[in-house]
Amino acid sequence: MQMGMAVLVLVIACGVLSVLFAIWAIRSVLAADQGTQRMQEIAEAIREGASAYLTRQYSTIAIVGIVVFLLAWYLLSLNAAMGFLIGAVLSGVTGFIGMHVSVRANVRTAQAASLSLAGGLELAFKSGAITGLLVAGLALLGVSVYYFVLTVWLGYAPADRTVIDSLVSLGFGASLISIFARLGGGIFTKGADVGGDLVGKVEAGIPEDDPRNPATIADNVGDNVGDCAGMAADLFETYAVTVVATMVLGAIFFHGSDALTNVMLYPLMICGACVITSIVGTFFVKLGVNGSIMGALYKGLIATGLLSIVGLGVANTLTVGWGEIGTVAGKSITGTNLFVCGLIGLIVTGLIVVITEYYTGTNKRPVNSIAQASVTGHGTNVIQGLAVSLESTALPAIVIVGGIISTYQLAGLFGTAIAVTAMLGIAGMIVALDAFGPVTDNAGGIAEMAGLDPEVRKATDALDAVGNTTKAVTKGYAIGSAGLGALVLFAAYSNDLAYFAANGQIYPYFADMGPVSFDLSNPYVVAGLIFGGLIPYLFGGMAMTAVGRAGGAVVQEVRRQFREKPGIMTGKERPDYARAVDLLTKAAIREMIIPSLLPVLAPIVVYFGVLLISGSKAAAFAALGASLLGVIINGLFVAISMTSGGGAWDNAKKSFEDGFTDADGVKHMKGSEAHKASVTGDTVGDPYKDTAGPAVNPAIKITNIVALLLLAVLAHMA
């Protein structure tokens, strides 16, 4: 136990170091030059809008959170309720601080880019690293410190149901914040983007981020609340939920074993080691002699990945060792095999990054095919974009299948869980790449609105083009890890269910229930699969509808301002930017509530609905389990299709900004008919990649978390 205590303290120290590094980076970013007075005024407007939105969003979520906290206390225990509170608060804090920094880094990045491309890259990436390392550090601290409190201060055994229920509740707290942040932020950002583009670019013929567009500040606010705060909450949740699910599986599989304590500390130690490798990896991001921005970012990612192999070895040595740990379902589990599973997780991450970049990167076949289709019109652009979005699901799915089968062969379901933990271990670096995107996007907007030299806009555009790809890449990573993480949660559900059923004398609700069969000949299983499969589609449809409504409101507002203030187009009158921001804030908060509750309530409806119809608890649990699989499988394909397809549409549009040469050798420039067709495609792709697709992510996991909590609640019933 002494060694276990030392490892736990070391894990907590790694989390603290990550937060300290983020604080140092914040001081460094805020010390940079803010540029001209005009630049600072624009940045202040973006900052005010983002803060107003996030404050209102979290105030709304807090009401839901208080109700859930009281329910968790009443139905489970105070410890479980506190776990929920820790997960929710830390998830919110991560997003808030990340956005707080990004809305201050944007103007500083624009100023740095006016001096050199390398300076702009360094500042934008450093601000992204702050969000990334806060996500990893606070998620690791949340789980490890609460586990320390439960097992050391309160004296519970590591596999005690109180510990497991409390940690699962922590994951639920993070999930609830995540789904609201992802969906609300996505509705805001894409409502502004779609509305601003349709009237500004297509109708008025003015460029992106033109200060004459009344929606331009709202668009820049949206980049921060969607891509920074939203992604931070999403990956915080995936990180926390995956670590918790792996610990729960460890507690189930190794219950009563001497290796139990070390097995439960193993995923925490992997994440602790990988936090350190992510910190070291940030120092490798430097612009090389070839001037490749993506190359500079990939240097950091590759360094983190290679160092993480060493980190995995350290985690093995300090916890489970290299020999045999125990036997699970007749399969011998060794430390060496678990180490290889961790390596497979890192390889899966690398492959998903490469595949996503191929489908969304400029000058790659998929993006060029959409740009080429734009030459023949709006309809062909949309058709080809949909074709690319569907095609983009195949390779990631094959990689994920390979990861599942290979890790299962090596170490069973616990091996798969360790692979996902290793994937999430490097989340600090991955989120840094993502949060880099909104900062560079905002920097370009500020440069345009402040009327800086065209060379500055050229530098920020180069950073922004890479930022678009990194945002797409990180979404691919987030979806892949979410799909695998949800599979681990499903394994926890099925094994938890088997545990309760086998111990009916302790848990009366499960006594005399009979065996639960997930056999496909069971009609309740098929019904559950179909019901679960519809959730990502219905959820995605609701999200797209919400963006359409918000975007429509922005279109009306921008048209109204152009109509009532004709001086806007000549520069004699100033647009009312705050009106569009306020309108979108209200719309996003209003539109996010019902879709967000769908994946939370669905498992409860499935269980009690089937129980009412069949009168059989076993049939109800089988239908619920099958519905979780339906959500995971369809959710994975819907999310990958939407995010990769949307990213490809976006970069196809960007191809025209520097001039796109078609198959016949004709060059099409910005403002051409082909460019207008590409803007239409991007208008469809925007809510695909930034609202519906990413929000399916937390929806997949929250259904599984709710199912786990439902088991815990039923187990507490007399």
From Swiss-Prot:
Kindly provide the name given to this protein in its UniProt entry.
Answer: K(+)-insensitive pyrophosphate-energized proton pump
Looking at the UniProt record, the site noted as Determinant of potassium independence sits at K471
Substrates-to-products reaction catalysed = diphosphate + H2O + H(+)(in) = 2 phosphate + 2 H(+)(out)
Entry EC no(s): 7.1.3.1
Domain of life from the UniProt record: Bacteria
Please give the organism.
Brucella suis biovar 1 (strain 1330)
Membrane-topology annotation of the record: Multi-pass membrane protein
Q: Give the residues the record marks as binding Ca(2+).
A: D650, D682, D686
Q: What's one GO-annotated cellular component?
A: plasma membrane
Q: Where in the cell is it found?
A: Cell inner membrane
Which Pfam families is this protein grouped with? H_PPase
Q: Which gene encodes it?
A: hppA
- Annotated transmembrane regions: 6-26, 61-81, 83-103, 112-132, 133-153, 168-188, 235-255, 265-285, 300-320, 335-355, 385-405, 413-433, 472-492, 524-544, 593-613, 620-640, 695-715
The feature of type site (Important for ion transport) is located at R182, D227, D234, D690, K701
Q: Which cofactor does it need?
A: Mg(2+)
Which is an annotated GO molecular function term of this record? diphosphate hydrolysis-driven proton transmembrane transporter activity
Residues annotated for Mg(2+) 1 binding in this entry: D193, D197
Q: Which residues bind substrate?
A: K190, K689
Q: Which HAMAP family does the record match to this protein? A: PPase_energized_pump
Q: Sorted alphabetically, which PANTHER family does this protein's record hold?
A: K(+)-INSENSITIVE PYROPHOSPHATE-ENERGIZED PROTON PUMP
How does the record describe its quaternary structure?
Answer: Homodimer.
Q: Does the keyword Cell cycle apply?
A: no
